[in-house]
């Protein structure tokens, strides 16, 4: 496999593209959720989950092993006081920012050129919010932009595990050497690369609209 790091992708032989969501299509900022939870009394939010690590409780939620109600109860226990459900949801969703229109336009355009897929480590509460937000702002649901979408909380697996990449490949009869995976987190690449998938690290300050898709 080839790791593609240049600003302009070499797309020769690439026929399928797998996109990450947060930090690639949807702008996110973990700091905003950290600050929101600090106001609620949880002062070490980033010790539990960030772009680069996750604790067992949050991993269970992002792999569908906890219900929304169980997640909210767990947050109340972490904070140590009975916060309102709406407060927790608002703080949890604070990290979700915007979908730049140019990215949505790109995804619509390249569907005629590549088979495109979404592969996201996410959860039920976030999914409800960003799905509604995209429809409100752009008149389209996230699922309509791809041939198929894979959310960690529905398939009960998450990146960087090899199984979730195997699922996407086998589920859609994809050849790894014809497939490109775009993500903003380097830790998500090793297992994909072992399977022969090409990868592109979307570095801070770069945008999918600028990399030659």
Residue ranges and their predicted role:
Residues 12-101, 112:
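N-terminal helical cap/lid subdomain that shapes the substrate entry/recognition surface
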Residues 85-135:
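Substrate-recognition element of Asp-dependent hydrolases with the DxDx(T/V) motif
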Residues 2-14, 124, 131-213:
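Asp-based, Mg2+/Mn2+-dependent phosphohydrolase catalytic module
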Residues 32-35, 56, 70, 74, ...:
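Alpha-helical elements of Rossmann-like donor-binding domains used by nucleotide-donor carbohydrate transfer enzymes
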Residues 18, 119, 181-182:
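Generic enzyme active-site microenvironment
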Residues 20-23, 64, 118, 149, ...:
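Generic structural signal for small/hydrophobic residues in well-ordered secondary structure
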């Amino acid at each position: 496999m080839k790791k593609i790091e240049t600003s302009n992708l070499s797309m020769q032989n690439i026929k399928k593209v797998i996109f990450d969501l947060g930090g690639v299509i949807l702008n996110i900022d973990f700091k905003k959720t950290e600050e929101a939870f600090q106001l609620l009394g949880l002062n070490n939010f980033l010790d539990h989950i960030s772009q680069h690590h996750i604790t067992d409780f949050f991993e269970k939620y992002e792999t569908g092993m906890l219900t929304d109600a169980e997640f909210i109860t767990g947050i109340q226990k972490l904070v140590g006081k009975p916060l309102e459900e709406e407060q927790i949801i608002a703080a949890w969703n604070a990290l979700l920012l915007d979908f730049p229109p140019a990215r949505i336009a790109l995804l619509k355009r390249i569907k005629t050129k590549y088979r495109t897929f979404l592969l996201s480590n996410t959860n039920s509460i976030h999914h409800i919010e960003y799905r509604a937000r995209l429809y409100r702002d752009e008149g389209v649901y996230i699922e309509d932009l791809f041939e198929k979408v894979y959310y960690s909380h529905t398939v009960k697996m998450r990146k960087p595990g090899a199984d979730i990449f195997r699922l996407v490949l086998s589920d859609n009869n994809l050849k790894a050497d014809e497939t490109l995976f775009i993500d903003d987190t380097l830790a998500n690449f090793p297992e994909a690369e072992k399977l022969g998938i090409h990868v592109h690290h979307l570095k801070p300050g770069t945008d999918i609209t600028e990399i030659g898709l």
